[in-house]
Amino acid sequence: MPSLSQPFRLATLPKIASLSNFSLQADYVQVADGTFNESTNNITLGISGSSISQYIINPTPKLTFDYPIPSTNIITACNAEKGQANIDGNIEASTDDEANNEKTINTQKKRNVEIWAFGLMVNKGNYTLNVITKALEDTTDTSNDHLSESDIDNKAYTGSDEFLSQYKIKAKAKVMSIKIDTKNSLVIAILQNGLIEIFDFKLTLLHSFDISYDNLKYAKWFTENGTEYVFVLCPLQDDKVCYKLLELTDCGSGESSPIKELSSTIIEGFSFENSKLCYQFGKLYKLNQGKIYIYSLPHCQLQQVIEFPMVDKLSPGDDLISFQPVSVNRVLLTVNNVIYLLDLLHCSTLSQRELTHVKTFQLLKSAVINSEKSHNSKTIAIGISTKNGPNPTSSLEIINIDVGTNTLKDSLGKSFQVGNNDSSVILKPLFDDKDINDKRVKCNDVSGDSSVPVLHCNEVIEKLSALQDNDITSFDDIFFKELKIKEEHYTEKDRYISDPGFLNKVLDLIFGKFSGNDYPKTLTFLLTHPLFPLSRTRNLLSLLRDQPRLFKQAIVTCPNLPLNELLEELFSIRNRELLLDISFRILQDFTRDSIKQEMKKLSKLDVQNFIEFITSGGEDSSPECFNPSQSTQLFQLLSLVLDSIGLFSLEGALLENLTLYIDKQVEIAERNTELWNLIDTKGFQHGFASSTFDNGTSQKRALPTYTMEYLDI
């Protein structure tokens, strides 16, 4: 179930000049992307004017490592990654000559390290890029008493050393984004002047790529099918922005640049200033003036605009807003001290929490998870909280998040969209003007001559009671004509029939006047009514068992059917179609725990008969008779049956059939997975291959000229 926990404190921010402006704290505290995920226990942050710090979360939040920086330095970008790197070192080794001289030998040793890279701004126009190599705490070196030139263990670097290496260079412009590639030992810095520079871990410049714009404001790296991509946004005049998509290719391709431009587009009406941006799973989200604009990649086309009622009346400068993604179509939004978990697909507020102990809470970073492809629905986010009072203090706090199941079920009844007040006060007419007659009551408050029907319950009951037994035709004529019902099943136009007492009396007359051989069409209508009386659902299935059409209708549409009766019918029926209907109804209406508890009360013989029917491979029950969705449905129900009774209660022959059935299901799942991966790979290649891959040409071939597109938004 979607939920937001109460945040807990990680550390208190220092009271320094660079952090005195609370509205800019989120820009002056940078969180390293590389090591921040839903299961991390280490968080690396760059705190402007203070230090590059590393904290652990469990069992008790505390500072584990700290690299101080001058109080006048502002951190513009920060990242960290764990991996292996070649560490240089010098040792003194004796030679075999007569003078017994010593010479210095340069050595390299590959070690498990942590790479920290960050950009600093000392003052406007003075920028630096820094790389620190830090030994992991569990890294140890094997000692060797006998040193040789071919196999020398450098004793100078041990697990207790603070840093293995430190490098610093002057940057040509403000560092906006940093990516660390531990596989190829690279640091990729994206600068505000439009340069993308690639360094090794010693900050030796290897490649440089110019995007031709000197006002880069946003850059985001993402991975698709093992390939790294980055898109950048450069604001232009007249609310225009330049969008560029680039690919990071194999860095070992020689002298050619590993950065390749895939597309470039000028987007009009983007309004970059005062906007909050975030990206997840192929979509770019922009929050501006109470509206969120959703752009789809790779062409950055506007897909949807959603209005947020919780932020549309805010005064700029008075309230602090932050915005971060957490899962597919789900984002976190904070307005002052209120946190919202939003579903942008169904426009709903899944959960919200007001932090009464603080004045504001600003999100810094969230760990994005794909809850559609994994069973994990829990993640974390880190932010800055500021307390009330004359001397407010700010703290780093972590919040635990449950994003839910990513289905419509999470959003039912939680929409944040506000309807029109005029249309919500007065009900709209259910019927056209031509249906108005003397038995309708005019609604003068509604524009036109709209009306709603009047329900004369007592008159209808009296007329139905006066009929003779088994007079099906007269019963249906009175019921449908008196109530102005046009269909034999419930529709939205029948909403005015909402009296449970009236429905109960009609059912009493039906079961009292008609035998079990045949029933009027009125019963079909009532079985589709969402207000079917709860008291009448008991023993309803057994009463309708001899009427196949009504029996199936009750299973599919009648609300509030008891679970125990559904299970009894499920374990006694030998019809494939009804078996699927009942199983779908059970899985849809009841929880797994309640199903298992009720199964334990049933006879083991009935349960075994059900398992035998499913796994025996007969004409009506073999896996080949079901489509993939039906087979998955029965497989899920079968797992609940096995959980409730246990495998030890089954006999040998039944276990063999069950094993064969499960093997077939696993084989189908493996085959479907392979096909899905093939389709997914081919689909992605068709999306990007036109400008990225060319199997018939060399990697050194020049890129085709890109096109400029102007979009009217």
UniProtKB/Swiss-Prot annotation:
The modification Phosphoserine is found at residues 148, 150. This is U3 small nucleolar RNA-associated protein 8. It comes from Saccharomyces cerevisiae (strain ATCC 204508 / S288c). Keywords: Nucleus, Phosphoprotein, Ribonucleoprotein, Ribosome biogenesis, rRNA processing, Transcription. The modification Phosphothreonine is found at residue 95. Pfam families: Utp8_b_propeller, Utp8_C. InterPro entries: Utp8_b-prop, Utp8_C. The lineage of its organism: Eukaryota, Fungi, Dikarya, Ascomycota, Saccharomycotina. Present with 16800 molecules/cell in log phase SD medium.
